[in-house]
Amino acid sequence: ADIGAGTGYYSFKLSDKLPQGKVYAVEIQDEMIAVLKKRKAALRNRNVEIIKGSAMSPNLPGYSADIVIMVDVYHELEYPHEMLQSIKKVLKKDGKLLLIEYRGEDPAVRIKPLHKTTVAQLNKELSANGFTLYYKGGFLPIQHFLLYEKK
């Protein structure tokens, strides 16, 4: 599930790699949902399902996702606690949550501070909501790549 799918860049990339699977493209903005629908039709895609989410929930069935990704989305959440609790219900038993966020610790990352997040802050918030850090990738030049699992 790609929460905050936007134009579907990651949703459709994942779809190509998982032709027998299902990819949920979750978006709250109607304009982006329209873009997703047009793109899905243009690509004749059959395994991306477009979902209208809300500020508090991705509106997905329980235990329906092996992985949830949020790319440059977490810092934008209006209700992070509620969203994380909803994501916990969506993830399958061994499911994972992937967050990619701009590095708040690095002043060289030329992004407005309100669009950056530190690992310490993410770990604190995720831990308080029943997640633990599973893997931290250091291969992206200006972003964190953090994979969490349910406690």
Predicted regions span which residues?
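Glycine-rich phosphate-binding loops of nucleotide-dependent enzymes
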Residues: 4, 65, 135
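A short acidic, Gly/Pro-enriched loop at the edge of an enzyme's catalytic core
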Residues: 58-68
